[in-house]
A protein has these predicted regions:
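Catalytic zinc-binding patch centered on the HExxH motif and its immediate surroundings
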Residues: 100-113, 122-140
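Short, polar loop/linker segments at the starts of domains and inter-domain junctions
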Residues: 44-51, 133-135, 194-197
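Structural recognition of the beta-strand scaffold that forms the well-ordered cores
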Residues: 31-34, 117-121, 146, 162
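Positively charged n-region of N-terminal signal peptides that target proteins for export
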Residues: 1-5
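The catalytic-center signature of Zn2+-dependent metalloproteases
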Residues: 138-213
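Propeptide-to-catalytic entry region of secreted or membrane-anchored zinc metalloproteases
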Residues: 21-110
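Bacterial N-terminal signal peptides
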Residues: 7-18
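Solvent-exposed loop/turn segments at secondary-structure junctions
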Residues: 37-41, 76-79, 123-128, 152, ...
Length: 213
């Protein structure tokens, strides 16, 4: 059965986060700032990276041959304790984007930053819509996203939106069993995760990152 929805929202100017200045000598790096919600305190950064980010990072390396840095940041009042349950998912994303932008402006710009993404990790779904649950939300080609740990594919799905991947170009593959690529909007319980993007979305991501260099 279909178990989840992953909406992508159009990027608005008021929620755009600017990437830091890159010097000519710096190595361009894609930086993912990961903010585990305070409710995830029992999960270590190492465990989160192993379970939810390693295969995704391998996929990005394959697509773009680009250094990827994941920076876990915890216990930031106003960010990692934000209320995300019981409100509209798009409203939660707007709140998160504003909070992340405020925080980012207070931080020094890391040398070599190519692009920065800001991801809030949550334990639970964001919203129920009838028989469906919304487990993640992101601005398309934006910098802000929220992903629940309810599915191992949600992190890759939402970060994919920020890198220009789309639902329409997701597909079903076969790796010993039928599997869904990262960008499937509604997961079907009998299919596994491919832990990769479709060829079309790989091309979208590669072109997006190429334009930033």
């Amino acid at each position: 059965m279909h178990t989840s929805l992953f909406p992508a929202l159009p990027l608005t100017l008021s929620l755009t986060l600017n990437a830091p200045f890159v010097s000519a000598e710096a190595t361009p790096t894609l930086t993912i700032w990961v903010f585990p919600h305070d409710e995830l305190s029992e999960l270590s950064d190492e465990q989160l990276q192993k379970d939810y980010f390693e295969t995704w990072m391998d996929e990005i390396h394959l697509i773009a041959r680009l250094p990827v840095t994941v920076r876990f940041t915890r216990r930031i009042p106003g960010l990692t304790d934000m209320t995300y349950k019981g409100q509209n998912a798009s409203a939660a994303l707007s709140d998160w984007a504003d909070a992340a932008w405020t925080w980012r402006r207070q931080q020094p710009s890391p040398e070599g930053g190519l692009d920065n993404k800001y991801l809030l990790l949550t334990r639970d779904e964001l919203e129920r819509q009838g028989n469906h649950s919304i487990y993640g939300v992101a601005f398309q080609t934006g910098h802000s996203a929220i992903a629940s740990l309810s599915s191992y594919a949600t992190v890759g799905h939402e970060l994919g939106h920020t890198l220009s991947a789309t639902h329409e170009q997701a597909d079903i593959s076969f790796n010993g069993w039928f599997c869904e690529t990262y960008m499937f909007p509604q997961r079907f319980g009998l299919r596994s995760n491919c832990y990769r993007y479709s060829d079309e979305n790989r091309e979208n991501i590669a072109n997006y990152l190429k334009r930033l260099r």
